[in-house]
């Protein structure tokens, strides 16, 4: 028997669930157990909490200790029946759902639970028979009291509304808030493999919109789409050890087929350079075969061992990866910046997220690249930077390794007769953008009510909600018809609109639902609105309300959506600019970081100095505290060297301008900060 209980807590408090693993015939009385654990009013957990604690569970019948994430959340109490913990008998436990069962010795169950718990002490072994015997006797019943006046009952929908609402505040508990909004806002659902997530239509629409824009633009640059297999032989993956070294701990391997071990292990691609470039060498035989410009829309697997986070740190994610080859460096350099500007447009024009384009430091550039360019975002709520997308110039590093070369078109017959090597290696680029874009958008615009969608990427741009409804069958049909007609008119004009005609839900419940899902604009339509020829419009991002005439409504809404898109970007840009501060003295760096800001500093660009900045800022920020290996670093790392140096004021040139960390001459402004 495995049960999940939920104690009574304050509405604003995070639940502290209790998982009980006991023999089927053990009486697990919740009253004495709650008293032992000092938890009030233990009750069986509802389906949503079960799903949160055990992602693979579809119902209470699927509750099991085996699919728990490792390590389990520190808020979870694990209670193990002493009759199980000390027994060498076999016990049946569900593997992932009630449809699959395994048998383990009781002592092995105890050892397993202790292995996934934050500490062995986190598993509480309880003698339920003794607990029952020591429980206080029930009090004698008092004389019956006069019947109290019956209080009006809350509508069931009130409880639903609380469960549906975002439980965490963005400023107070950002990780809890983020998890809340991506799940309750219907962007993702949890899968039964840790670090893997289901992208629901609202999030996949964002990715499709990005794909449509970006794919159209790169095709104008001469890029063609292709697809290479996801499997990589061990020999091919290890051919470029320097490049793959950074990915080595994250590579997932296929080692079996059925019950048989494979002779050679097969990797699942973490990136595709070593997959694609042998074929570039095969296909590029002459300078006339250049440039070769290919792009893949695919998924890659990087078996992250850190705490996974939807969209930001996942074991499988969707991305595009472009791989191009050119005869000259100048051609390749131009493409690097062309692609980076498209990434900037994705963030700023579609997601309404400001970014800083720049070049990565030597320490932070892509392994095997001559240089890496990037668009860097920043999340003011957490004070951390986040890499948005990268475009790398690989130089001739990979073409030398994979022998991608052509006859130099400038070589003469005399050169050949003289025995000169007339082969030249091609210049290569690679560039990629992933579904991390969605997470950055959520963190930038979301609020305590839920998601806030920029109209350009919203699955639903406008929702029409009927109001002023009456009781009685058929009385509301004219209102429903008017709402559907309004939604159809907007849809015919190319606006993604829907009418919420769900029965059994109040308008207030629907308002909260669509606010949490981030729909940019809500139109309310009732009898008075219909009579007046107007509709009440409510903007999601600031809750501003105004009436629109129904005549010419499509054109009006189209303009308002454009205004919302711009307003979201402008608001985010103001916060972004206020959070990026020029600093010219070391003493101001850590206080600025602690104020949830990034710093722009005069920097010498020396790799050792970069390491020193990271370590020194971490030590000063920690001030002797023990470092939490699971927490993001408190040190400042190089985010990029911005292309637009004038954005931060005139650089203080001259021999007297020193790097803020060392005595070397500073070269440029560099953006440093804490990061994801």
Residue ranges with predicted function:
Residues 1-676:
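NTP/phosphate- and nucleic-acid-binding module
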């Amino acid at each position: 028997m495995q049960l999940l209980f939920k104690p009574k807590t304050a509405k604003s408090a995070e639940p502290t669930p209790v998982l009980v693993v006991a023999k089927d015939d053990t009486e697990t009385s919740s009253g004495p157990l709650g008293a032992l654990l000092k938890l009030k009013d233990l009750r069986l957990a509802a389906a949503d909490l079960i799903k949160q604690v055990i992602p693979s569970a579809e119902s209470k019948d699927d509750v099991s200790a085996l699919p728990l994430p490792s390590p389990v959340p520190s808020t979870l109490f694990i209670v193990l029946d002493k009759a199980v913990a000390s027994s060498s008998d076999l016990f049946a436990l569900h593997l992932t759902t009630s449809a699959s069962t395994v048998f383990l010795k009781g002592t092995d169950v105890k050892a397993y639970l202790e292995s996934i718990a934050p500490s062995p002490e986190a598993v509480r072994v309880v003698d339920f028979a003794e607990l029952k015997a020591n429980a206080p006797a029930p009090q004698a019943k008092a004389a019956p009291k006069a019947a109290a006046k019956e209080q009006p009952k809350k509508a069931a929908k009130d409880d639903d509304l609380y469960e549906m609402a975002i439980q965490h505040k963005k400023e107070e508990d950002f990780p809890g808030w983020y998890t809340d909004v991506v799940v309750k806002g219907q962007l993702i659902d949890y899968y039964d493999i840790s670090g893997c997530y289901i992208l629901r239509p609202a999030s996949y629409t964002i990715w499709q919109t990005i794909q449509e824009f970006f794919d159209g633009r790169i095709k104008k640059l001469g890029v063609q789409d292709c697809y290479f297999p996801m499997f990589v032989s061990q020999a091919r993956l290890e051919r470029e050890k320097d490049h793959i070294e950074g990915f080595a701990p994250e590579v997932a391997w296929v080692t079996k087929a059925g019950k048989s071990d494979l002779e050679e292990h097969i990797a699942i691609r973490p990136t595709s350079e070593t997959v694609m470039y042998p074929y570039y060498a095969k296909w590029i035989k002459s300078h006339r075969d250049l440039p070769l410009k290919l792009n893949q829309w695919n998924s890659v697997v990087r078996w992250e061992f850190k705490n996974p986070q939807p969209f930001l740190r996942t074991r499988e994610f969707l991305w595009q990866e472009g791989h191009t080859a050119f005869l000259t460096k100048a051609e390749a350099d131009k493409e690097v910046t062309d692609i980076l500007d498209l990434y900037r447009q994705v963030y700023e024009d579609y997601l309404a997220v400001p970014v800083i384009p720049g070049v990565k430091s030597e320490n932070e550039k892509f392994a095997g690249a001559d240089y890496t360019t990037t668009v860097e975002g920043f999340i003011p709520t957490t004070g951390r930077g986040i890499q948005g997308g990268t475009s790398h110039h690989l130089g001739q590093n990979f073409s030398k390794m994979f022998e991608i070369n052509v006859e130099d078109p400038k070589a003469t017959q005399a050169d050949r007769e003289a025995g000169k090597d007339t082969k030249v290696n091609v210049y290569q680029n690679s560039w990629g953008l992933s579904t991390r874009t969605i997470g950055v958008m959520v963190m930038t615009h979301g609020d305590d009510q839920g998601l806030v969608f920029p109209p350009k990427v919203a699955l639903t741009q406008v929702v029409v909600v009927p109001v002023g409804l009456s009781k009685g069958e058929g009385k509301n049909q004219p209102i429903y018809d008017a709402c559907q007609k309004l939604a159809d008119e907007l849809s015919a004009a190319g606006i993604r609109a829907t009418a919420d005609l769900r029965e059994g839900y109040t308008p207030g419940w629907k308002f909260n639902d669509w606010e949490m899902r981030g729909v940019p604009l809500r139109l309310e339509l009732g009898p008075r609105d219909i009579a007046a020829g107007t509709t009440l419009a409510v903007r999601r991002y600031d809750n501003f309300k105004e009436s629109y005439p129904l005549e010419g409504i499509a054109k009006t809404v189209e303009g308002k959506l454009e205004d919302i898109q711009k307003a979201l970007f402008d608001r985010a840009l103001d916060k972004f600019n206020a959070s990026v501060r020029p600093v010219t003295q070391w003493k101001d760096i850590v206080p600025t970081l602690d104020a949830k800001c990034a710093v722009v500093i005069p920097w010498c660009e020396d790799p050792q100095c970069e390491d020193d900045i990271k370590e020194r800022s971490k030590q000063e920020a920690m001030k002797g505290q023990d470092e939490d290996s699971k927490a993001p670093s408190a040190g400042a790392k190089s985010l990029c060297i911005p292309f637009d140096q004038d954005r931060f004021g005139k650089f203080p040139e001259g021999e007297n301008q020193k790097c803020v960390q060392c005595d070397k001459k500073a070269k440029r402004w560099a953006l440093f900060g804490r990061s994801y």
